[in-house]
Amino acid sequence: MSNYRRDFTKGGLYFFTIVLQDRTKSYLTDYINEFRSAYKQTCEHYPFETVAICILPDHIHLLMQLPENDDNYAIRIAYLKTQFTRQLPKECRQFNKNRQKYRESGIWQRRFWEHLIRDDKDLANHLDYIYYNPVKHGYVEVVKDWPYSSFHRDVKAEIYPEDWGGNPDLKIKGDI
């Protein structure tokens, strides 16, 4: 058993990877409006700043800035998962006995990857990783063509050029 201990830093900037249980499903993009609604509800109920996000068919990459006196990212992730699952059609929500016992939905992996951003270089690497991910997985050939990403917001803010190509060799811990 792993001795991994999660970091809890008040006001921390965290990178998350949140993954569907069945990686062959594309619920996150098939039901993008439901995801957006669940995300909005989560932000309203448990405020945080979205520094960057990329929604892929079977997983999400998210850079979340917590409020100054708050370290509870887990409640935000759990709430997002719950709200999205509730909005899915019933046939998508599969439950087995063990998951019912722990009040878990069958669509999500139980755990998620979390990483506290340490410095500006770490932040830049994670931003690049998030935005290049749809290209890495073969969903698009260029970053700007992926519609489910905050990349477009960052282009408008002149943080990234629209023709930014990414770094195909960039690897980060927790790469999926």
From Swiss-Prot:
<keyword id="KW-0255">Endonuclease</keyword>
<keyword id="KW-0233">DNA recombination</keyword>
<keyword id="KW-0540">Nuclease</keyword>
<comment type="function">
    <text>Transposase responsible for transposition an insertion sequence (IS) element. Transposition occurs in 2 main steps, excision from the donor DNA 'top strand' into a single strand circle and its subsequent reinsertion into the DNA target. This increases the copy number of the IS.</text>
</comment>
<dbReference type="GO" id="GO:0046872">
    <property type="term" value="F:metal ion binding"/>
</dbReference>
<dbReference type="InterPro" id="IPR052715">
    <property type="entry name" value="RAYT_transposase"/>
</dbReference>
<dbReference type="InterPro" id="IPR036515">
    <property type="entry name" value="Transposase_17_sf"/>
</dbReference>
<dbReference type="InterPro" id="IPR002686">
    <property type="entry name" value="Transposase_17"/>
</dbReference>
<feature type="binding site">
    <location>
        <position position="61"/>
    </location>
    <ligand>
        <name>Mg(2+)</name>
    </ligand>
</feature>
<keyword id="KW-0378">Hydrolase</keyword>
<comment type="subunit">
    <text>Homodimer.</text>
</comment>
<feature type="active site" description="Nucleophile">
    <location>
        <position position="148"/>
    </location>
</feature>
<feature type="binding site">
    <location>
        <position position="59"/>
    </location>
    <ligand>
        <name>Mg(2+)</name>
    </ligand>
</feature>
<dbReference type="Pfam" id="PF01797">
    <property type="entry name" value="Y1_Tnp"/>
</dbReference>
<keyword id="KW-0815">Transposition</keyword>
<keyword id="KW-0479">Metal-binding</keyword>
<protein>
    <recommendedName>
        <fullName>Putative REP-associated tyrosine transposase</fullName>
    </recommendedName>
</protein>
<keyword id="KW-0814">Transposable element</keyword>
<keyword id="KW-0460">Magnesium</keyword>
<dbReference type="GO" id="GO:0006310">
    <property type="term" value="P:DNA recombination"/>
</dbReference>
<dbReference type="GO" id="GO:0004519">
    <property type="term" value="F:endonuclease activity"/>
</dbReference>
<comment type="similarity">
    <text>Belongs to the transposase 17 family. RAYT subfamily.</text>
</comment>
<dbReference type="GO" id="GO:0004803">
    <property type="term" value="F:transposase activity"/>
</dbReference>
<dbReference type="GO" id="GO:0043565">
    <property type="term" value="F:sequence-specific DNA binding"/>
</dbReference>
<dbReference type="GO" id="GO:0006313">
    <property type="term" value="P:DNA transposition"/>
</dbReference>
<keyword id="KW-0238">DNA-binding</keyword>
